[in-house]
Amino acid sequence: MKEHKARKRFGQNFLQDTRIISDIVNAVRPQADDVVIEIGPGLAAITEPLAKKLNRLHVVEIDRDIVCRLKTLPFADKLVIHEGDVLQFDFNGIAGKKKIVGNLPYNISTPLLFKLAEVADDVVDMHFMLQKEVVDRMVAAPKSNDYGRLGVMLQYFFDMEMLIDVPPESFDPAPKVDSAVVRMIPVKHRIGKADDFEHFAKLVKLAFHQRRKTIRNNLKELAGDDDLQAVGINPQDRAEHIAPEKYVALSNYLAGKAV
């Protein structure tokens, strides 16, 4: 079979470390009847061991050459191939509670994670290879340098745990950054339920818009000092000092005042 060269425009770095591959599959714990979706199967490093354990495996792939390769594999009859951009993919179009796994293209990881949060109610768990810097931000606690909008928003939907550190030499071609595997398990209302999710999302985005400024300055168009203090937020604190549940509480307090 003709060798496939990684394409930079698709953010392709192909995992080749057999130990890491085995660790990922063991973390996913696929059972024969599970509904599993793999994002970016690439050269099938994870696809093959998953397919061996599953009756059916959905894969989402944008690269036409890779799609053609997938169709020639010995286990191709187990694959349901969805060709196209994963950012446009309808995850709800696949019935059942889903496990989602993938070596995500680093150039679209943040918008893809926000998209996946929208389907959290129909997900059992997710396991992703990502740039380690992104995983650090996802799991970060308040008062840490990595804590920000991404962490707050994803922690609203998921319990998350970094599972595996992955060095650059585990890939071909080797990326210029370290990678990590993260497990994401949907947890409803772990930090409280936002009465108006769009308001909550807007508030969090504004809060972290200028990290060096106080929460009073960043949220001045939405909240005054009295509003902040009503839910236990010090107006002089910066956004990274405020726990996710405080953002939910503030959003609900402001939404309640507007009624």
From Swiss-Prot:
Its EC number is 2.1.1.182. Coiled coil: none annotated. InterPro entries: KsgA/Erm, rRNA_Ade_diMease-like_C, rRNA_Ade_Mease_Trfase_CS, rRNA_Ade_methylase_Trfase_N, rRNA_adenine_dimethylase, SAM-dependent_MTases_sf. Pfam families: RrnaAD. It is found in: Cytoplasm. The keyword Metal-binding does not apply. S-adenosyl-L-methionine binds at residues 13, 15, 40, 61, 85, 103. Keywords: Cytoplasm, Methyltransferase, RNA-binding, rRNA processing, S-adenosyl-L-methionine, Transferase. One of its GO terms (cellular component) is cytosol. GO terms for molecular function: 16S rRNA (adenine(1518)-N(6)/adenine(1519)-N(6))-dimethyltransferase activity; RNA binding. It comes from the Bacteria. The keyword tRNA processing does not apply. It catalyses: adenosine(1518)/adenosine(1519) in 16S rRNA + 4 S-adenosyl-L-methionine = N(6)-dimethyladenosine(1518)/N(6)-dimethyladenosine(1519) in 16S rRNA + 4 S-adenosyl-L-homocysteine + 4 H(+). Its main location: cytoplasm. Belongs to the class I-like SAM-binding methyltransferase superfamily. rRNA adenine N(6)-methyltransferase family. RsmA subfamily. Specifically dimethylates two adjacent adenosines (A1518 and A1519) in the loop of a conserved hairpin near the 3'-end of 16S rRNA in the 30S particle. May play a critical role in biogenesis of 30S subunits. HAMAP family: 16SrRNA_methyltr_A (MF_00607). This is Ribosomal RNA small subunit methyltransferase A. It comes from Neisseria meningitidis serogroup A / serotype 4A (strain DSM 15465 / Z2491).
